[in-house]
């Protein structure tokens, strides 16, 4: 039996993914289409979708009004902080298990990478893993249940890259690591995509595309 995939969708929120968003990222529409195509093609093998979510207060240090470099975005409970409707509704329609991981809710911390505080990888049975992670503020805990990870989202040169870095640096005390695959056409970047491509190359990460992806052998 094949292992299920954990699909991690980083910060695909309306302030980033919509053209009228507070911090709209070019290429988000193309990335959305690729993610939707991937989910439809691999739905039976996707055990869960984890949405990471920027969840700032109006006082967050990253905002220009507070001395940061970004316009205010993804403010808690605002429309712009909402997860992209089309992807969310597809997961609901297909009955895919969804989890949401809040980050960036500590006003004093710029939290690009979602999983900086990962716990122990626990083996359950012969081929099943349970990995826990906390956010920086320790008020959100999540467990993802597969060592086969496909990651995509916004923005490739910031939150996606740093979240990948969190995942690939982790090794359990017994030497277990995660099988991280990058859904490149499901990523939108503030730059032209060079940063995420070079990062994947430097770290020998498998790059996949929605149109050609075939589920890895179990």
Residue ranges and their predicted role:
Residues 2-8, 13-17, 30-45, 57-218:
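Active-site-adjacent betaalpha module
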Residues 15-25:
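Glycine-rich N-terminal loop/short-helix segment of MobA-like nucleotidyltransferase
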Residues 48:
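Substrate-recognition element of Asp-dependent hydrolases with the DxDx(T/V) motif
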